[in-house]
């Protein structure tokens, strides 16, 4: 990237008019680190992803910590590069810290969350936060624009998904076959539903506050109020036009029957005030794409959806698969073997240079590959032009983060609590000695990405 100084105002900018940050770096990867010292439980460090160093290229004593960050065991970075903002969830304190990429500084911690969150997202306009508060059995909604926080009861909730446009949120309950969505209420609905549960719509499972509700949580149901049945659903990804939600049915790897992807229109589930429209399908008319290789995570790219999951074997172990789905005709290809992983557990997926897709799994040493003496690393490099696996990287521990360093033909990855660098041309490992961290690395994000799609927390 080329930095440009604007004449007369002393401001230096680079890509898309972004101001040059205090570090002066234009290819930055931010690393979430747990227990970086005996006196700290968390830190965020910026490294130069062009030179692959944690210090300035001309001064080894100049490093780039994110100032003001005091998180406790950071585990995820929701990367919003277009907004020059990151949201870092800290599992030790149950807090969500907001990070300014332009200032390379923490800008505050979000209040109003209910205990720890097993899954949490903020909309890109930073107006709403949705969190699965599993221990408290509530879906927490923080309305940052209006200053309210709402706890909608949903026993067993453990995952939430939010669409890129920030208009639809879906909630999932562990070991359940149902899906839920929140919706903000109009003033007339608030009045109509203020008499308690007997005045709520048939598919509403909670409305809060009950004496004058502002939000209701609805079960996904047809126009007659009959709940739609899924198969251990745990996540949703969305079409590029935003009109369709692909519900991932985890199936056997989550204790269910058959893995698949179910298609729902997003219009009826829009949570923003007065924008919901249309109706959800009936059970018989809902499109369902069988994905026998497993379906616990997915990534949509134009008219293709890449789905990964774990498939049970006769010996009781699981093997990892990637399935390519053609969204133009809703057909799935044959499963392609990739890294094994923990059944139903979160995984990471990202597209990178040279037509590559990278998949990060955890507990890959407990799967079928390890048991049979096959390559069993947790990080898979997949070629999207040939739909083949290029390689499975050697085992270095759980893979918990990936970042695409756009245009430089490499990715950063976190494996076994340390940072590694791999070529997108052939998967070769680059020298990582100057980006390794003290403590336990847990996630990485390329914060100078061109778009918000360079993100594995979605």
What residue spans do the PLM features occupy?
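Predominantly soluble domains enriched in secretory-pathway, periplasmic, or organellar proteins
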Residues: 9-458
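Sec-dependent bacterial lipoprotein signal peptides
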Residues: 1-9
């Amino acid at each position: 990237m080329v930095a440009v100084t604007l004449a007369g105002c002393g401001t230096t900018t680079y890509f898309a008019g972004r101001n040059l940050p205090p570090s002066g770096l234009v290819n930055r990867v931010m690393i979430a680190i747990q227990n970086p010292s005996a006196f700290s439980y968390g830190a965020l460090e910026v490294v130069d992803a062009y030179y692959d160093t944690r210090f300035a290229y001309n001064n080894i004593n100049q490093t780039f910590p994110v100032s003001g960050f005091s998180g406790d065991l950071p585990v995820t970075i929701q990367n919003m590069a277009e907004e020059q903002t990151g949201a870092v969830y800290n599992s030790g304190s149950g807090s969500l810290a907001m990070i300014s990429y332009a200032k390379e500084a923490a800008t505050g911690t979000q209040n109003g969350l209910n205990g720890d969150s097993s899954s949490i997202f903020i909309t890109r306009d930073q107006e709403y936060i949705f969190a699965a508060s599993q221990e408290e059995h509530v879906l927490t909604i923080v309305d940052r624009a209006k200053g309210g926080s709402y706890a909608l009861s949903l026993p067993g909730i453990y995952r939430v998904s939010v669409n890129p446009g920030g208009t639809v949120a879906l909630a999932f309950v562990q070991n359940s076959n149902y899906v839920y969505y929140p919706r903000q209420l109009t003033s007339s609905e608030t009045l109509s539903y203020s008499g308690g549960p007997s005045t709520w719509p048939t598919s509403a499972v909670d409305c809060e506050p009950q004496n004058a509700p502002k939000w209701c949580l609805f079960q996904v149901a047809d126009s007659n109020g009959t709940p739609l049945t899924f198969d251990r659903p745990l996540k949703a990804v969305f079409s590029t036009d935003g009109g369709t939600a692909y519900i991932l049915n985890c199936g056997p790897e989550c204790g269910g029957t058959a893995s698949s992807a179910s298609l729902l229109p997003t219009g009826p589930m829009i949570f923003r005030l007065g924008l919901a429209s249309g109706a959800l399908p009936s059970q018989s008319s809902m499109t369902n794409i069988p994905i026998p290789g497993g379906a616990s995570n997915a990534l949509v790219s134009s008219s293709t959806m890449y789905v990964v999951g774990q498939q049970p074997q006769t010996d009781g172990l699981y093997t990892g698969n990637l399935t390519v789905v053609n969204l133009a005709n809703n057909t799935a290809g044959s499963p392609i073997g990739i890294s094994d992983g923990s059944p139903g557990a979160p995984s990471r997926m990202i597209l990178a240079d040279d037509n590559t897709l990278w998949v990060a799994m955890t507990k890959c040493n407990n799967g079928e590959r390890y048991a049979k003496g096959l390559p069993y690393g947790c990080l898979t490099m997949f070629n999207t032009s040939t739909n083949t696996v290029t390689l499975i990287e050697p085992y270095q521990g759980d893979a918990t983060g990936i970042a695409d360093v756009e245009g430089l033909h490499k990715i950063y990855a976190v494996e076994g609590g340390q940072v590694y660098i791999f070529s997108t041309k052939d998967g070769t490992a680059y020298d990582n000695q100057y980006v390794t961290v003290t403590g336990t690395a847990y996630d990485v994000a390329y914060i100078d990405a061109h778009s918000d799609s360079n993100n594995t927390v979605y």
